[in-house]
UniProtKB/Swiss-Prot annotation:
Signal peptide: none
Ranges in coiled-coil conformation: none
Family statement drawn from the similarity comment of this UniProt entry: Belongs to the class I-like SAM-binding methyltransferase superfamily. RsmB/NOP family.
Protein name: Ribosomal RNA small subunit methyltransferase B
Name of the top EC class for this enzyme: transferase
Cell location: Cytoplasm
Active-site residues, Swiss-Prot/TrEMBL: C375 (nucleophile)
List of residues binding S-adenosyl-L-methionine: C254, A255, A256, P257, G258, G259, K260, D277, D303, D322
Family annotation (InterPro entries): MeTrfase_RsmB-F_NOP2_cat (IPR049560), MeTrfase_RsmB-F_NOP2_dom (IPR001678), NusB-like_sf (IPR035926), NusB_RsmB_TIM44 (IPR006027), RCMT (IPR023267), rRNA_ssu_MeTfrase_B (IPR004573), rRNA_ssu_MeTfrase_B_ent (IPR023541), RsmB-like_ferredoxin (IPR054728)
One Pfam family per UniProt: Methyltr_RsmB-F
Function: Specifically methylates the cytosine at position 967 (m5C967) of 16S rRNA.
Length: 429
């Protein structure tokens, strides 16, 4: 039996690591969840994700409720108060229980002398809640995005930025990809129905199913057998443009964690696939995904800017480049992105994308297809990136996705329930 731990203090420490140390929640959270019961795993995740989703609101409230911010060794208490405020604002946890557990969290982080302070701040919020929220809802902080990102979205999407921000602040739906080598989508939906769950097919992507209510993967029919994979609908859209065929040599570049690698092999089981990623640790997930689905691909660690180091002079029929990007299209799925990214990251990412595109183009066969994809919402990484590439690359031609003036197809977050995503299909003349 797992030792009872104070979830509020665990959440506060995890959030502090994200915000103060720039660590990714997807790296921090899983080891913490191993320390708690199955029942508590979900609550710990809700507290971490929820606080990061609403961080600017909680920060704003603390600044109103406290004369001085908590600094230095007391900084964890700042995040513990955030966890308390989040519970009072957004969860069904009875207020007395939320307060008691949060105050007790001070003991777990070895700050028992601050129990009274935490209790006082949270009770003051309860008394002033209506007037504080009215003031907050009239401020720019209500958008729950850092100002640099808000400005970029307003500039890029003058008519749509508010709906983008709103979608980013929602909980994401759970999308699945049915493995067509095992089941048709309809036959798997029937199995899902028999298991007492409901799912809905995507109108455009033939393998995509949205669950009515998110569920643990082990509850899904045939998950362990490889019948189904968790993957957002927009990410599945890459296959529409790549259209892999049996017998082709296909490169999946920046492939980890392997969702698109395995999708290529579901669509074209006899394709020869090379999956490459710069991050050796994340490549272990590519191997895991291939193993669960019973598939074979060549997997290599390598830098996309220097392809000759890992593929020599090899030429490919098709290349999928899921480029490293700001991930500003998947904020609803990874709310820590809002606080991990900086404005200065964008030109650096655009430069890296440009270098990878130029380097890999020479490894595409004449007549071959390259699909450039990102989960970004920013033109510098998307349409402007492809426009510049087309201008400097004489043998590149845009195909089916946009126009030379406005190249690519941009999915907005929440549109047809998918994530924000960009695709450009290029043909080598």
């Amino acid at each position: 039996m797992k030792k009872q731990r104070n979830l509020r203090s665990m959440a506060a420490q995890a959030i502090e690591q994200v915000v103060e140390q720039g660590q990714s929640l997807s790296n921090i959270l899983p080891p913490l969840q191993q320390k708690v019961s199955d029942k508590d795993k979900a609550l710990l995740q809700e507290l971490c994700f929820g606080v990061l989703r609403t961080l600017s609101q909680l920060d704003w409230l603390i600044n109103k409720l406290m004369a001085r911010p908590m600094t230095g060794k007391q900084r964890t208490v700042h995040y513990l108060i955030m966890v308390g405020l989040y519970q009072l604002l957004y969860t069904r946890i009875p207020p007395h229980a939320a307060l008691a557990e949060t105050v007790e969290g001070a003991v777990a982080i070895k700050r028992p002398q601050l129990k009274g302070l935490i209790n006082g701040v949270l009770r003051q919020f309860q008394r002033q809640q209506d007037e504080l929220l009215a003031e907050f809802n009239a401020s720019d902080a209500r958008y729950l995005h850092p100002s640099w990102l808000l400005k970029r979205l307003q500039k890029a999407y003058p008519e749509q930025w508010q709906s983008i921000v709103e979608a980013n602040n929602q909980r994401p739906p759970m999308w699945l990809r049915v493995n067509r080598t095992h089941h048709s989508r309809d036959s798997w939906l029937a199995l899902l129905d028999e298991a007492g769950m409901k799912g809905f097919p995507h109108a455009d992507y033939p393998d995509a199913v949205q669950l009515e209510t998110p569920a643990p993967v082990h509850a899904l029919p045939g998950f362990e057998e490889g019948w189904v994979t968790v993957q957002d609908a927009s990410a599945q859209g890459c296959m529409t443009w790549l259209a892999p065929q049996n017998g082709e040599h296909i490169l999946d570049l920046c492939a980890a964690p392997g969702g698109k690698t395995t999708h290529i092999l579901e669509v074209a089981p006899e394709a020869q696939v090379l999956a490459v990623d710069i991050d050796e640790q994340r490549l272990s997930r590519v191997y895991d995904n291939l193993k669960r689905l019973g598939m074979k691909a060549t997997v290599k660690q390598g830098d996309g800017r220097y392809p000759s180091q890992w593929c020599g002079e090899q030429q490919f029929d098709r290349i999928l480049l899921d480029a490293p990007c700001s991930a500003t299209g998947v904020i609803r799925r990874h709310p820590d992105i809002k606080w991990l990214r900086r404005d200065r990251d964008i030109p650096e990412l655009a430069q890296l994308q440009s270098e990878i595109l130029d380097a890999i183009w020479s490894h595409l066969k004449s007549g071959g297809t390259l699909v450039y994809a990102t989960c970004s919402m920013l033109p510098e990484e998307n349409s402007l990136q492809i426009k510049a590439f087309l201008q400097r690359t004489a043998d590149a031609e845009l195909c089916e996705t946009g126009t030379p003036e406005q190249p690519g197809k941009q999915n907005l977050p929440g549109a047809e329930e998918g994530d924000g995503f960009f695709y450009a299909k290029l043909i080598k003349k």
